[in-house]
Curated annotation (Swiss-Prot):
It comes from Cricetulus griseus. It is found in: Nucleus; Chromosome, Telomere; Cytoplasm, Cytoskeleton, Spindle. This is Telomeric repeat-binding factor 1. Phosphorylated preferentially on Ser-219 in an ATM-dependent manner in response to ionizing DNA damage. Residues 58-268 are annotated as: TRFH dimerization. The acidic N-terminal domain binds to the ankyrin repeats of TNKS1 and TNKS2. The C-terminal domain binds microtubules. Gene3D superfamilies: Homeodomain-like, Telomere repeat-binding factor, dimerisation domain. InterPro entries: Homeodomain-like_sf (IPR009057), Myb_dom (IPR017930), SANT/Myb (IPR001005), Telomere_rpt-bd_fac_dimer_dom (IPR013867), Telomere_rpt-bd_fac_dimer_sf (IPR036507), TERF1/2 (IPR017357), TRBD-Containing_Protein (IPR052450).
Amino acid sequence: MAEDVSSTAPSPRGCADGRDADPTEEQMAQTQRNDQDQFECQELLECQVQVGAPDEEEEEEEDSGLVAEAEAVAAGWMLHFLCLSLCRAFRDGRSEDFRRTRNSAEAIIHGLSSLTACQLRTIYICQFLTRIAAGKTLDAQFENDERITPLESALMIWGSIEKEHDKLHEEIQNLIKIPAIAVCMENGNFKEAEEVFERIFGDPNSHMPFKSKLLMIISQKDTFHSFFQHFSYYHMMEKIKSYVNYVLSEKSSTFLMKAAAKVVESKRTRTITSQDKPSGNDVEMETEANLDTRKSVSDKQSAVTESSEGTVSLLRSHKNLFLSKLQHGTQQQDLNKKERRVGTPQSTKKKKESRRATESRIPVSKSQPVTPEKHRARKRQAWLWEEDKNLRSGVRKYGEGNWSKILLHYKFNNRTSVMLKDRWRTMKKLKLISSDSE
């Protein structure tokens, strides 16, 4: 998916360095967004007044199509809000918050049956930050091609986000290219550094003054050359954070943030103490309503995704893009092919159970740039898609129970025979044995 993704519509944003691409069009677009947000806020306030038990006749005549559309709109609000939270966690270096928000955004994307151009761009931003966060983890795989490093994948996604912007786009693009090579050299992978160089700078039509110098540095294996100081990892992160600040200022005007701000302002003006029971009841009612809505969104959209090939491809393609390692090798180009089917659809029940089973999976990375803290050693290691595939192949060849033989003939990541046995039992319970596409 990280290859040249055909955008469904031009980005409605101005230049990322603060300049307006087209003042007239930008102002018109902003006015339309503000009008739409104001309309949505008014609709929300009117709906709050009407909250109550529905009449039996209304309940019987409920328009399922209207409900599905309303849930899709709400999911879009949550997606934009989670993108904001992800940006803040990335900027502030809060690794645990980044991971939790990433997983929440992933869950929202699971339920999207279609994408607007704005939602697609929002997803690209989340994917880009996820790759950057895993930039120094060379074994983190985001593409079908196992050779592609996280920063290379981020570079390809970046080309899909900001192509129309010149200055900031070019600066970040160059600042990603050099660290992508430097990270390999820092890990002693000089052969891999040469391969990354060829993939990034191999275009004969590209004219960059430092290409020959960089190639010489790689051949000399000079990891600490002064050249890398001008294109350091730190400078790359700082420049990306400046872009993140731009996204935060842009998306702070989204509907959900405006509605939340109005609620906060209203509560402040009432000057109610923390021990005021009516206020507490109001908050509880709002929370319960939100939880009910969220549950409805999850149930309805899961039903929609099961019957739509395009939705299934979106679900499968975006899931691995948020995790630090690729779990479904055939999913990456789904969005590139405009939501065409690549994987096999999974049942709604299996999706929900699988999602619960993977919620606690945390990528292990000693040098993840967003993580100032060390991961706890007690965190369980996530099972990769390749490991599940090898386990299924091993059982087919040697039979269930021959775990030692399967472990000997297939590649697993520091697993034991007991782990294979437990994983097989889990896969059978979650119905992952024959439904996953290989």
